[in-house]
Design a protein with these regions (language model features):
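Extreme N-terminus of proteins, especially the signal/transit-peptide cleavage junction
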Residues: 1-10, 75
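Glycine-rich phosphate- or other oxyanion-binding loops that anchor nucleotides, phosphorylated ligands
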Residues: 36-182
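Short linear motifs in intrinsically disordered
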Residues: 4, 29-35, 89
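Short, conserved "active-site rim" segments that organize catalytic pockets and cofactor/ligand binding
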Residues: 9-33, 43-44, 50, 96-102
Length: 182
């Protein structure tokens, strides 16, 4: 992580499905579990500028957790919102970090964001499914939370403050069932 960003007072909210996906963020930002909040597991730094919520898997959980985090953390319109998680892919390589540049699901197709930063990692389209998919030929990235996260945060913040990043976890050469072994 960029030390300038780490040490700044930029307000950031992370929505992550699973604890294993969140570990590096919790360590980097020195976030601790806050037992005050019981609907979801919530972590924050001492200054209350960095918050992370574990949403659980699925669009409904992601939408509920994002809304809950917005309310309890008193996020402003200029708060940065980041969704980090795993995704299946037939195009990338296992472990690649990808920036999402378009999101779709069975109900909608949203272009995201207004402008893309210049970064060195892959930019890919994301399809959010309600069930795990193993046909990787139809979509660049497949997850189960991204579109709901974007739908909610797009109402809470400007598009330029929303970021979705996915790590490729499964694909034609890495079976989704292998994820359960960890």
């Amino acid at each position: 992580m960029n030390q300038k960003i780490l040490n700044s007072n930029i307000s950031i909210r992370w929505v992550v499905a699973l604890k294993v996906e969140a570990e590096i963020i919790l360590d980097e930002y020195n976030m601790n579990f806050d037992p005050e909040f019981t609907l979801f597991q919530v972590f924050r730094n001492f200054e209350k500028t960095r918050w992370l919520i574990l949403s659980g898997v699925g669009r409904h959980n992601s939408a509920a957790a994002t809304t809950y985090l917005y309310m309890i953390s008193k996020a402003s319109r200029s708060t940065c919102w980041i969704n980090l998680g795993i995704a299946g892919s037939g195009k990338g390589h296992y472990g690649d970090l990808c920036l999402v540049n378009k999101i779709s699901n069975n109900d909608s197709s949203n272009t995201y964001p207004a402008t893309m930063p210049k970064v060195t990692f892959h930019k890919m389209n994301l399809f959010t499914s309600d069930v795990p998919l193993t046909d990787y030929t139809l979509h660049e990235l497949i997850d189960m939370e991204g579109s709901a996260f974007y739908d909610i945060t797009n109402k809470l913040s400007g598009r330029e403050f929303i970021c979705l990043m996915k790590v490729i976890s499964d694909g034609p050469n890495n079976d989704i069932e292998d994820l359960n072994k960890f």
